[in-house]
Amino acid sequence: MDETVLWQLSYGMYAIGAKHGAEDKGCIVNTIVQITAENPIIAVSMNKDNYTYEVIRESGQFAVSILGEEVDNNVIAELGFSSGRTKEKFKLFAAGHTKEGLPIVEQGAVGYLTCEVLQMVDAETHAVILARVVDAQKGDAKTPMTYAYYHEVKGGRTPKNASVFSSDELEADAKAKSEAPAAAGSGGAKKMRVGWKCPICGYIEYADELPPDY
């Protein structure tokens, strides 16, 4: 089977926020689908190893921040590449809360959904969470970020718990980026690009010197 065909499916980038007592918990997912229009129901794919999955299973509710193309890379780095078992990730960037007290990404999101769990369907490594959308509000961003934009423009990589994770894809992408030369200069000589890669989220900043706030 040619599993690369599955890469042609379209995905987004979403921050999930949940509450564990007084603590804010969350993660990044890329697979959310609207199932019904009237009294809207959505389906969320989430790895069962995620601590956020445990929190949602216990609390029965969560918020979705639909991330925009402008969102700070630190948001994805913290929510997507670290565990909420030992820290409150929403304290590490500009975050807000829904009227129900659920954590959301306050800056760089197209909109927010407040959801109540209806059912959790087992899907081997993952669970499909069917949830009722009980509230929806617009955010400050204009264009929702696609999974392709995250990889191709922001230079991001895939968390190992994502539903579309592929180690082969990541290795090929990293090799291509490291070997990619800049446009030919005078005399036809190729000049190598200098890039600084974040070890957490995989974002690559192309610059001769590392920015002071990187």
Q: PLM features: residue spans?
A:
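Basic, polyanion-binding surface patches
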Residues: 1-193, 205
